[in-house]
Design a protein with these regions (language model features):
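Positively charged, small/polar-rich N-terminal and surface patches that mediate targeting and assembly
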Residues: 1-116
Length: 116
């Protein structure tokens, strides 16, 4: 079984919606890293030296490769990433190997068989 890692940078107010959508699309779990910061094309605004950045979360999804594109597109819709700038991004990268997921393999095999 081959995996992809979806890395999602999302406004903290949309974290729950993105996680729910990803699970409904086939993700079997996630890891959340809170309090992330970043910058896009425009520098962040400040008010008397204090940052006005919105809070961000990083969500990691280790997903089966056949489900990855569907999950990625579902995340984009739930997070409204393409509707307005600065709402978030999601990327996927190939995973060479993974350990600690043997308990999820049977569930993933059943999901993939239904999809194919």
């Amino acid at each position: 079984m081959h995996f992809k890692l979806i890395i999602c940078f999302v406004e903290d107010g949309k974290t729950d919606a993105v996680m729910k959508a990803a699970r409904e699309a086939g993700a079997t779990g996630s890891t959340i890293i809170n309090n992330a910061r970043g910058e896009g094309l425009k520098q962040s605004k400040t008010f008397f030296g204090l940052s006005l950045e919105t809070q961000r979360d990083v969500i990691l999804f280790l997903v089966e490769e056949h489900l990855s594109r569907q999950i990625l597109e579902t995340i984009e819709q739930a997070g409204e990433f393409d509707q307005k700038p600065g709402t978030g991004i999601a990327i996927q990268i190939d995973v060479e190997d993974a350990v600690g997921v043997s308990h999820q393999i049977q569930t993933l095999q059943n999901i993939v068989e239904e999809e194919i």
